[in-house]
C-alpha cells in the first residue's frame, strides 16, 4: 500500500510542493496567518479524522467515542486553564461559525446588535450586510475617533439611543488596547449582552501581553490559528458565573444548532496548541510579536507614512496610503512581486470599496514565529517603504525580492 502522497498523487503533490516553497520564500505579513507547529500538524493529520462523534464528551450519538471523549475533554481543560474560563466549547470549525453560534444562542432574528464598522476595524460577522449577521439582525455600528481610537462616547450614545440586545467588542483591523470593562459597563446600562470576538488577539491574551476580555464579557469567541498559532478553527469561552443554562444554550447552538460531527483531528491539534501556549517560550514569542509590530510601525512613521491608530499595542496595524496616492490593491500587488505578502484593507471612512481600499494591513505574528527579530522587521519595513515610494521602479522591486529571499533562507519556516 502507498502511504505517501508524493508517490500516490504526483499531480497534487506538485502543487503542494509549490505552495510549501512559496511559504518558505515569501515574507508573510498577513495578520490572520501563522505557522502551525509540526506536532499540531501531526495531530491534525492523524487517524482521528476517521472518527465521527456527534454530541459532547459522555453524550455522543455514536459508539466508539471513548478516546475521542478524552481528547476533547483534554482540549477543553487546557483552554480553561490557558484563558481562565469556566466554560469552553472547542467544536466550532471556524471563528465565523463560533460567532454564528453565539448569535444563534442569544438573539432572535430582528434583534439589534451594535458592532464595530468594517471600515473602522470590525469584522464581517459583526454586522456586515453581506454576512448572516447583517441579514438576520438589525445592525448599528460604532467606530474610531479622529485619533484612530475606539470612540467610547459614540458607543455610549448609540447604546442609549438604540438599546441593542448585544454589543460586540473585538476587531480584525484595530491596533489599540480595548477597555473591556468600560464596554461591559455600557452594555450593562441597557441590559445588553457583551460579546467579544478575540480571534486576532487570542495568543496575546493567552500569554498575558494583552488584556483578557473573559472576566468582562458574557461570552468570548476566538480562532485557534492567527496569534494562537494552532490549527484553523474556533472556540467559545465564558465566565458566566457557572450559569449552566447559559452554557447549555451555547453548546446547543453549536451542536445540533449549526454543526454536525466535530472534527476530532482538529480538536486534537487544538489541544496541542493550547499546551504549547502554556510554555514560557510562547510568552516570549508574543512579547516579540508586539515589539516587532511597534518597530515596523515606527519605521513607517519615520518614512512619512500614516499608521492608523498610531503605535500598535498588538500584532497588527493599518497603513493609510492616501497621502501616497496608492490604493491598497496596487500596494499589495506590487509588494507580492517582491515576495512580500500583505492584504489590502479599508481605512476609517474609506472612499474606496473593500476590493480596492486605501490601505494595507500588516501583521507580525507569522514572521516572528519564523524567528524575525526587531532589526529584521525594521529592514523589511524599509524595503516596503522603498517600493511604495516608487512602485514603478523595477530595480527597487527586484532588489527587495533579493533581500527577501536572503532573509527567508536565514529564517526557514520549518
UniProtKB/Swiss-Prot annotation:
Its main location: cytoplasm. Keywords: Amino-acid biosynthesis, Cytoplasm, One-carbon metabolism, Pyridoxal phosphate, Transferase. One of its GO terms (biological process) is tetrahydrofolate interconversion. Its EC number is 2.1.2.1. The record marks 225 as: Plays an important role in substrate specificity. GO terms for molecular function: glycine hydroxymethyltransferase activity; pyridoxal phosphate binding. GO terms for cellular component: cytosol. (6S)-5,6,7,8-tetrahydrofolate binds at residues 118, 122-124, 353-355. It is an enzyme of class 2 (transferase). The keyword Amino-acid biosynthesis applies. Its cofactor is pyridoxal 5'-phosphate. It catalyses: (6R)-5,10-methylene-5,6,7,8-tetrahydrofolate + glycine + H2O = (6S)-5,6,7,8-tetrahydrofolate + L-serine. Pathway: One-carbon metabolism; tetrahydrofolate interconversion; Amino-acid biosynthesis; glycine biosynthesis; glycine from L-serine: step 1/1. The modification N6-(pyridoxal phosphate)lysine is found at residue 226. It is found in: Cytoplasm. Homodimer. NCBIfam families: PRK00011.1 (NF000586). Belongs to the SHMT family. Catalyzes the reversible interconversion of serine and glycine with tetrahydrofolate (THF) serving as the one-carbon carrier. This reaction serves as the major source of one-carbon groups required for the biosynthesis of purines, thymidylate, methionine, and other important biomolecules. Also exhibits THF-independent aldolase activity toward beta-hydroxyamino acids, producing glycine and aldehydes, via a retro-aldol mechanism. This is Serine hydroxymethyltransferase. The gene is glyA.
Amino acid at each position: 500500500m502507498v502511504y505517501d502522497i508524493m508517490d500516490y498523487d504526483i499531480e497534487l503533490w506538485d502543487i503542494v510542493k509549490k505552495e510549501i516553497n512559496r511559504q518558505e520564500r515569501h515574507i508573510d505579513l498577513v495578520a490572520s496567518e501563522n505557522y502551525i507547529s509540526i506536532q499540531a500538524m501531526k495531530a491534525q493529520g492523524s487517524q482521528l479524522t476517521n472518527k465521527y462523534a456527534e454530541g459532547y464528551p459522555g453524550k455522543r450519538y455514536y459508539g466508539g467515542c471513548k478516546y475521542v471523549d478524552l481528547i476533547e475533554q483534554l482540549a477543553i481543560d487546557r483552554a480553561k486553564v490557558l484563558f481562565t474560563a469556566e466554560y469552553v466549547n472547542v467544536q466550532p470549525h471556524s471563528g465565523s461559525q463560533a460567532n454564528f453560534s453565539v448569535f444563534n444562542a442569544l438573539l432572535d432574528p430582528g434583534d439589534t446588535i451594535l458592532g464595530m464598522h468594517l471600515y473602522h476595524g470590525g469584522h464581517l460577522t459583526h454586522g456586515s450586510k453581506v454576512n448572516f449577521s447583517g441579514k438576520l439582525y438589525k445592525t448599528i455600528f460604532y467606530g474610531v475617533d479622529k485619533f484612530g481610537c475606539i470612540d467610547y462616547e459614540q458607543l455610549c450614545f448609540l447604546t442609549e439611543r438604540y438599546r441593542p440586545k448585544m454589543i460586540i467588542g473585538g476587531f480584525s483591523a484595530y491596533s489599540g488596547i480595548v477597555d473591556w470593562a468600560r464596554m461591559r459597563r455600557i452594555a450593562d446600562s441597557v441590559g445588553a449582552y457583551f460579546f467579544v470576538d478575540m480571534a486576532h488577539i487570542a495568543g496575546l491574551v493567552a500569554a498575558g501581553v494583552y488584556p483578557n476580555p473573559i472576566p468582562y464579557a458574557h461570552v468570548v469567541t476566538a480562532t485557534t490559528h492567527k496569534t494562537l498559532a494552532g490549527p484553523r478553527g474556533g472556540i467559545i469561552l465564558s465566565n458566566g458565573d457557572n450559569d449552566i443554562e447559559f452554557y447549555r444554550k451555547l453548546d446547543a447552538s453549536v451542536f445540533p444548532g449549526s454543526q454536525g460531527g466535530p472534527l476530532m483531528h482538529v480538536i486534537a491539534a487544538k489541544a496541542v496548541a493550547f499546551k504549547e501556549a502554556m510554555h514560557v517560550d510562547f510568552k516570549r514569542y508574543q512579547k516579540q510579536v508586539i515589539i516587532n509590530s511597534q518597530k515596523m510601525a515606527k519605521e513607517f512613521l519615520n518614512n512619512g507614512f500614516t499608521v492608523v491608530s498610531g503605535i500598535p499595542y498588538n500584532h497588527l496595524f493599518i497603513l493609510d496610503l492616501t497621502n501616497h496616492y496608492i490604493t491598497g490593491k496596487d500596494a499589495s500587488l506590487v509588494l507580492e512581486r517582491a515576495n512580500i505578502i500583505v492584504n489590502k484593507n479599508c481605512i476609517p471612512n474609506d472612499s474606496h470599496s473593500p476590493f480596492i481600499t486605501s490601505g494595507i494591513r500588516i501583521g507580525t505574528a507569522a514572521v516572528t514565529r519564523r524567528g524575525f527579530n526587531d532589526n529584521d522587521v525594521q529592514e523589511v519595513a524599509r524595503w516596503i517603504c522603498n517600493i511604495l515610494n516608487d512602485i514603478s521602479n523595477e530595480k527597487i522591486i527586484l532588489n527587495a525580492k533579493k533581500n527577501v529571499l536572503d532573509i527567508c533562507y536565514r529564517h526557514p519556516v520549518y
